[in-house]
Amino acid sequence: MRRRRLLLLAPLGVLATWFLVTWATYPSDRTPTGAYLRVTKAVNEDRPEAFFAYIETAAQHACYTIGNYRKKTRSRILEAYPEPDRSRLAASYEDEAGATDGSQVFALYARRRGWLQRLRRDMSGVDQVEISGDRASVQTVKGSRYPFRRRENGIWGLTLFTASLVAEAEKAARDAEIVERAATDYERVRSMEGRAVIEGPR
């Protein structure tokens, strides 16, 4: 009976040992290699939101900015715009406005712009890593290079998407301004029309 129990427990012991060894030898995300491997894992799992923690800070902030502005913009459109513009424009902002946080905004863009597909095609094992201060470059065995920057918390963040996301955040801010001006105009016109109806012809 005891031998049978040992035979049953042996595979679990092997699995536990493998897990502990893997965990102990897996590079920290406070190294460029560790951050790169976590991005690779998330890409292979088709979960771009899972490597949001491994993009640089400016890109993360941009994702939150996009989501916040799109929520505000869509809300103003629904409040003040007349049809058919209200339904059309509200639908165009629906995805970003419906995102619960920056990681979901990032996932939307990663899929929409083909970033995930590109990473899946190009990513492979690490060949070499070059570090210069707070910047690093991870070169893969396929010859692709991935730039990283060390963030304030010590985690390395991929910089590939920063410029695009910052530009999109700036566009979201401009769009919000334009929509707010138009919404105010629509409300003013409705208010004037309402007063005219109440006062009647003179």
Enumerate the language-model features and the residues they cover.
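Short, flexible helical or helix-coil boundary motifs
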Residues: 84, 96, 100, 112-113, ...
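Mixed-charge, polar/low-complexity N-terminal
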Residues: 18, 22-25, 29-30, 35-36, ...
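Secondary-structure junction/capping motif
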Residues: 31, 100-105, 159, 200
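Short beta-strand edge/turn micro-motifs at domain boundaries
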Residues: 118, 124, 133-183, 187-188, ...
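Short, low-complexity N-terminal intrinsically disordered segments enriched in polar/charged residues
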Residues: 8-77, 177-179, 200-201
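Intrinsically disordered, low-complexity regions enriched in Ser/Pro/Gly/Gln/His and often acidic
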Residues: 11, 16, 108, 148-150
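Twin-arginine (Tat) signal peptide motif
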Residues: 1-6
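Short solvent-exposed beta->alpha transition segments
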Residues: 48, 52-129
